[in-house]
Amino acid sequence: MRRRKAKMRAYERLLNYVKVYTTSEDEQENVPSTSRQFDLGNQLAEELKKIGVQDVRIDDKCYVYGVIPATEGLEEKPAIGFIAHMDTAPDFSGENVNPQIIPEYDGGDVKLGDSEYALTLKDFPHLVSLKGRTLITTDGSTLLGADDKAGVAEI
């Protein structure tokens, strides 16, 4: 099987995924805790099919599965699986997410949009090591949902 290369980069997928409302509900014992999590699950299943992943399916618990066969001649080597969750924490709103993209971060405090919130160097001293890089944050009005949609985007 010849796989097609994904045309989107991981950060582009992340920006798409964080906009899908997948906030969980703590009081629910069902898996998933909300049916809206299937919105992202179905989107992921379609994307996997488009890039040539085999046996793509989504089950009644919203787990998305797919198979990428071993490279010819390496079929006897150990297999690997990747796991990431799609739901986001109910601690703060995850609906109508507006990511804030900061190209060439200047190394200082990061104001989160027009909100009262900021990522300060006092609270997050490691930020200085990201100077010059592109940061993706929330605008402060919602959670970003990068836990674990960033993992989903990478996979």
Where are these regions (language model features)?
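Short, Lys/Arg-enriched N-terminal segments with co-localized hydrophobic residues
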Residues: 1-7
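Electropositive phosphate-/nucleotide-binding environments in soluble metabolic enzymes
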Residues: 8, 35-38, 42, 149-152
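Active-site metal-coordination/substrate-binding segment of hydrolases
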Residues: 74-154
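Structural signal for hydrophobic packing residues in well-ordered secondary-structure cores
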Residues: 18, 22-25, 48, 52, ...
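A non-catalytic alpha/beta surface segment that caps or lines the substrate-entry region
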Residues: 29-77, 81-83, 87
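Alpha-helical scaffold segments in soluble metabolic enzymes
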Residues: 13-16, 43-46, 154
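N-terminal capping segment at the start of a domain
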Residues: 7-35, 137
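A generic structural signal for short
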Residues: 2, 32-33, 143-147
